[in-house]
């Protein structure tokens, strides 16, 4: 029996321990610091100012485009009116028409008093 006691002394008690892994320290974030709040506020203000500026520029562009379209429409109407008036001037300035009206008014055609004017 003495052998049994001797053997137990030779082999120390083996305790099975799990390998301990170092615990990862989880950082808990508290409230934001004053510096972070200032930076976020400034960044947000810049974003809002840029967004407002973009919207206002787009509104100005829209207004200018509307004015341009209105002016172009007026120009086209005026050009059409000018063309109609040119046709009317040519029609009213015909030699036969002028001669007819002159005869109705009692005027006579005298070749010595006629001057030829080069029209445009």
UniProtKB/Swiss-Prot annotation:
GO cellular component, one term: cell division site
Claim: Repeat is one of the keywords in the record: no
Topological domains annotated Extracellular: 59-120
GO BP terms: FtsZ-dependent cytokinesis
Membrane topology annotation: Single-pass type II membrane protein
Cell location: Cell membrane
Record-linked InterPro entries: Cell_div_FtsL (IPR011922), FtsL/DivIC (IPR007060)
Highest taxon, organism lineage: Bacteria
Alphabetical UniProt keywords: Cell cycle, Cell division, Cell membrane, Membrane, Transmembrane, Transmembrane helix
Positions on the Cytoplasmic side per record topology: 1-37
TM ranges: 38-58
Chain residue ranges for the region called Disordered: 1-22
Composition skew (Basic and acidic residues), residue ranges: 13-22
Protein's UniProt keywords contain DNA repair: no
NCBIfam families listed in its UniProt record: ftsL_broad
Family: Belongs to the FtsL family.
Role noted for this protein: Essential cell division protein.
Protein name: Cell division protein FtsL
Primary gene name: ftsL
């Amino acid at each position: 029996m003495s052998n049994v006691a001797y053997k137990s002394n030779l082999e120390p008690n083996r305790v099975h321990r799990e390998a301990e892994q170092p615990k990862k320290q989880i950082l808990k974030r508290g409230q934001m610091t004053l510096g972070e709040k200032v930076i976020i506020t400034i960044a947000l203000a810049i974003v809002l100012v840029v967004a407002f500026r973009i919207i206002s520029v787009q509104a100005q562009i829209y207004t200018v485009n509307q004015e341009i379209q209105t002016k172009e429409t007026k120009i086209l109407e005026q050009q059409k009116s000018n063309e109609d008036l040119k046709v009317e001037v040519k029609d009213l300035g015909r030699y036969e028409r002028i001669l007819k009206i002159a005869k109705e008014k009692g005027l006579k055609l005298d070749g010595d008093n006629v001057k030829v004017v080069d029209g445009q």
